[in-house]
């Protein structure tokens, strides 16, 4: 599903920002999950995954301790606006409380193409904190 997410972002923006390969992503996901460096909440219908929230824990002084970042969040287009995303956010906030995280953070893809995503997160209790997501890649 992470590949479907990055494909959708690239398609809607008209720019190829990602180059995920499904097999490599699945192997990496399994390794990160096994090492406890990544977590995932998955919404299922029988054996069919409908959506997921992938997260990692971090610590920061500004957050006053441990917190988590929802790194990837995706619901299959056929299942959007049916409560799947809200259920995933509810599960993530419960997990945050159980683990004593001081907050959950996430980034949205660029606006205006993903305004609907921003509106969804706002309805679920997230607030815009400003800034821009930036990256540095070795060798670039």
Feature locations, PLM:
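Conserved acetyl-CoA-binding loop of GNAT-fold acetyltransferases
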Residues: 121-131
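Conserved GNAT-fold acetyl-CoA-binding loop/helix
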Residues: 3-29
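Conserved acyl-CoA
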Residues: 76, 87-103, 127
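Conserved beta-strand in the GNAT
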Residues: 40-42, 48-57, 69
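Glycine-rich acyl-CoA binding loop
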Residues: 43, 81-86, 96
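Conserved beta-strand-loop-alpha-helix junction that forms the acyl-donor binding cleft
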Residues: 80, 103-117, 136-139
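A short, internal acetyl-CoA/4′-phosphopantetheine-binding micro-motif in the GNAT/acyltransferase core
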Residues: 73-80
